[in-house]
Amino acid sequence: MSALRRSGYGPSDGPSYGRYYGPGGGDVPVHPPPPLYPLRPEPPQPPISWRVRGGGPAETTWLGEGGGGDGYYPSGGAWPEPGRAGGSHQEQPPYPSYNSNYWNSTARSRAPYPSTYPVRPELQGQSLNSYTNGAYGPTYPPGPGANTASYSGAYYAPGYTQTSYSTEVPSTYRSSGNSPTPVSRWIYPQQDCQTEAPPLRGQVPGYPPSQNPGMTLPHYPYGDGNRSVPQSGPTVRPQEDAWASPGAYGMGGRYPWPSSAPSAPPGNLYMTESTSPWPSSGSPQSPPSPPVQQPKDSSYPYSQSDQSMNRHNFPCSVHQYESSGTVNNDDSDLLDSQVQYSAEPQLYGNATSDHPNNQDQSSSLPEECVPSDESTPPSIKKIIHVLEKVQYLEQEVEEFVGKKTDKAYWLLEEMLTKELLELDSVETGGQDSVRQARKEAVCKIQAILEKLEKKGL
């Protein structure tokens, strides 16, 4: 600042500087001080404005001079220029209007920086809106078109942003004519892709080409990646129409649920039958699919539970649970070692009889009757059930220590009496065997009751 003042450009220079360094050089006549005198009251003005307005007009004046080339940073001018600077000081009244920009009054003229800067928030909204749902893509951008391209390009590739995002999203979700449809079809596979996908699937070396010549290959958007899992896709061919029919990208066509339900005639989605659920391709494709299943077991360990998984690439398809033992009879031993169904083949007669019997003695009675379980009449089964409970109560009676007034005594006596009533309700049906079994059970309960009474004395 001192250098500038010595050069005679500062508006706050006193008359002393004007005398020695003024444009006239040497001692300036008395005439220059009068024009410079109006400038002396001017420099005090900025401090006043600083106190009042927080640096608005004074700073704007000085930077305005710097931007215009009149004040502290001029390109060349002597005291006539400060005279103009003084004029600019007197032009302070218009400058306070630029308080919104603070002291950068020339920011308006500098379009590139300030114009792009305040626009950025709007552009962010534009880019996000056009990216998310595309509905607002055409609404905002008309304002600052160039800025939209440059700004969005900073975050998304410029060509990619405007063409793919803003155009493709409306076409896929709203199918609006704003955007070129081919772009959207490329981004989100649509009708065109469904026609193209089956041949592509057939050409992929990892997938068995077409074992059913009449069937086309469906397009799995997520399943294509795993080449390590050779897709026995041809088995799914009957559903190709169902795959291609829902053109939109999403739930309808790509996932096998909608198509799998009709494909399984039985109707039960889980373990419906041992016959193949594929009406047309079940028998011919049973030989080729088992080899495909082995790598699938390695890649999808959880799919091993469904033996039909080897017939379908999609891990979440419903067909996993359908044909349980159709195709992979040769692989059944491998699957059986890995898949453990919870007691599927067991007879539940044994389980029901064993679970209530927590004692070793209790298992004897049910085992005696289990061999003839199928031919056992319901009355005999009821007697056996009562005897199981009685055996448990008998053990409780043996462990009982107390008197008749104890609550445990009352409980045991009541439970035994209840079992007696249960035996009384058994209908013999004129069969001597049932009558004899009921008589023995009643005698046993009575003996236990007598034992309990003796213990309670």
UniProtKB/Swiss-Prot annotation:
Task: Enumerate composition-biased segments (Polar residues).
Answer: 166-182, 320-333, 347-365
The cross-references to InterPro entries, in alphabetical order and at most eight, read: BAG_chaperone_regulator, BAG_dom_sf, BAG_domain
Sorted keywords for this record are:
Chaperone, Cytoplasm, Methylation, Phosphoprotein
Q: GO CC terms on record?
A: cytoplasm; cytosol; membrane; nucleus; plasma membrane
Give the superkingdom in one word.
Eukaryota
What is the designated name of this protein?
BAG family molecular chaperone regulator 4
Recorded hits in Gene3D superfamilies, A to Z, give:
BAG domain
User: Residues where Phosphoserine occurs?
Assistant: S7
Q: Where is this region: Disordered?
A: 1-101, 113-136, 166-333, 347-377
Bias (Pro residues): 30-47
- On this chain, the residues bearing Omega-N-methylarginine are R40, R53, R108, R185
Q: Which residues form the BAG domain?
A: 379-456
Q: What SUPFAM superfamilies does this protein's entry cite?
A: BAG domain (SSF63491)
Q: Which Pfam families match?
A: BAG (PF02179)
SMART domains membership? BAG
Mind listing the GO molecular function terms for this protein? Answer: adenyl-nucleotide exchange factor activity; protein-containing complex binding; protein-folding chaperone binding; RNA binding; ubiquitin protein ligase binding
Q: Which GO terms describe its biological process?
A: cellular response to epidermal growth factor stimulus; cellular response to tumor necrosis factor; negative regulation of apoptotic process; negative regulation of mRNA modification; negative regulation of protein targeting to mitochondrion; positive regulation of actin filament polymerization; positive regulation of cell adhesion; positive regulation of fibroblast migration
Q: What does this protein do?
A: Inhibits the chaperone activity of HSP70/HSC70 by promoting substrate release. Prevents constitutive TNFRSF1A signaling. Negative regulator of PRKN translocation to damaged mitochondria.
Q: Where is the composition biased (Low complexity)?
A: 8-20, 274-284, 294-308
Higher taxonomy = Eukaryota, Metazoa, Chordata, Craniata, Vertebrata
What gene, per UniProt, encodes this protein? Answer: BAG4
**Assembly with partners or alone:** Binds to the ATPase domain of HSP/HSC70 chaperones. Binds to the death domain of TNFRSF1A in the absence of TNF and thereby prevents binding of adapter molecules such as TRADD or TRAF2. Binds to the death domain of TNFRSF12. Interacts with PRKN.
Where is this protein chiefly located? cytoplasm
UniProt note on tissues of expression: Ubiquitous.
